[in-house]
Amino acid sequence: MITRFAPSPTGYLHVGNVRTALVCWLYARKQNGKFLLRFDDTDTQRSKDEYIREIENDLVWLNINWDSSFRQSSRFDRYEDVFNYLLKEGLIYPCYESKEELEFKRKMKLKLGLPPIYDRSALNLTQAEKDKYSERAPYFRFKIDQNQLISWNDEVRGKVSFNSENISDPIIRRVDGTYTYMLPSIIDDMDFNVTHIIRGEDHISNTAVQIQMLHALKASIPIFSHLSLLYSDDNKISKRVGGSSVKDMQSYGLEPMAINSYFAKIGTSNPVSVHTRMCGLIDSFDITTFSQAPTKFNIDDVLKLNPKVLCSMSFDDVRNRLQSFNITSPSFWNFVCGNIDKFSDIEGWAKICSGDMIPVIGQDDKDFIMLALNMLPQGEVRDNTWNLWISNIKQHTDRRAKNLFTPLRLALTGLSTGPELAKLLPLIGRVEIVRRLSYSEVQ
């Protein structure tokens, strides 16, 4: 089986794209099938190579790999062949209305309470009328086979049916000779043997038309799944909505697996759960769990998931990334992973555990810190050093609770709050602990 993800390279990947790509990928991998990446770049004015590169980079970052890829712009000759075949068969016809004339017709139909379906007037033009339009380049429509009930079994929505009388003949080629989405898409699906098409519910009416096109070309009909659209604050998500691109999510410090864990489950009957490997998402994937109801997207939910993903990642998962902080110790990661919201927070903890941290010692605490220095147990700092140290200190001071712990934390970390010092001390090490506690002496 083969699925495909077909973004238009007219902008960056937004969250709606990510969800579709991920679901297509998971479906293919679950079935041991293939995942095809197709760039719908027939809009030559808006499509850009830089967006193709960025989309590829974003998918790689998200751990979504593809088995093959191509651009529709490389297949125009093939589209022309099929176009000419359908034209010869009388299934495509030229039209000459301007945009203004089409808009006028649409408004008049709506005013009369009629559906704004194209009236097929171009099919009834006399030769004399066609001659009048000789200076106008035509655009072309596909001729829908009317009086037909178009049905398919959607894996998300169940049985879906359209009466072809309620469908307007779609424009498939523009005045400038470029193609719209409709025809190239089904030619590619046919030629590349795409067996399963998963996309947003905004394509449902397109599916009805494309099924007729596939019948006209005597091609197999793929299995369709139409996902509910993502909404955020009651607005449909699109690439034009700010703050919802992969680039934005990267800037928030989100982990790829936090994003994948979230989008693999929202809009399904299953709760969102933490996964650090794509194989876990593959094992739990089931297209039939997706709901038809609108799916609410909330970036705050992904942000809350991010620390849980980090906490679940092993040292081997992050070993290479830690090298940029000169960290090679598994014990450091095992301690820090439960105390960070995003990976870049590592920098702060690396400074705390290195010699770059400047202690914070108040004037009223200098004598107490010197006492604490003298009470520090001898030898290597271990997991039990903190408890032994505090026990020694308490025997020589009346300080208790925060009056005892806060000055020590400030001197050792520069912070008034944080994780257990008992676990942190071995990472700092005896030499550095002594340096920090001695800081008041050199002021």
UniProtKB/Swiss-Prot annotation:
Short motif 'HIGH' region, span: 7-17
Q: What is its EC number?
A: 6.1.1.17
GO molecular function terms listed in the Swiss-Prot or TrEMBL record: ATP binding; glutamate-tRNA ligase activity; tRNA binding
Q: Which domain of life is it from?
A: Bacteria
Compartments, as annotated in UniProt: Cytoplasm
Its BP terms in the Gene Ontology are: glutamyl-tRNA aminoacylation
Q: Which Pfam families does this UniProt record tie to the protein?
A: Anticodon_2, tRNA-synt_1c
Keywords (A to Z) from UniProt = Aminoacyl-tRNA synthetase, ATP-binding, Cytoplasm, Ligase, Nucleotide-binding, Protein biosynthesis
Query: What residues bind ATP, as annotated?
Result: K239
Q: What Gene Ontology cellular-component terms does the record carry?
A: cytoplasm
Quaternary organization: Monomer.
Similarity comment text for this entry: Belongs to the class-I aminoacyl-tRNA synthetase family. Glutamate--tRNA ligase type 1 subfamily.
Q: What is the protein name stated in its UniProt record?
A: Glutamate--tRNA ligase 1
Q: Which organism is it from?
A: Ehrlichia chaffeensis (strain ATCC CRL-10679 / Arkansas)
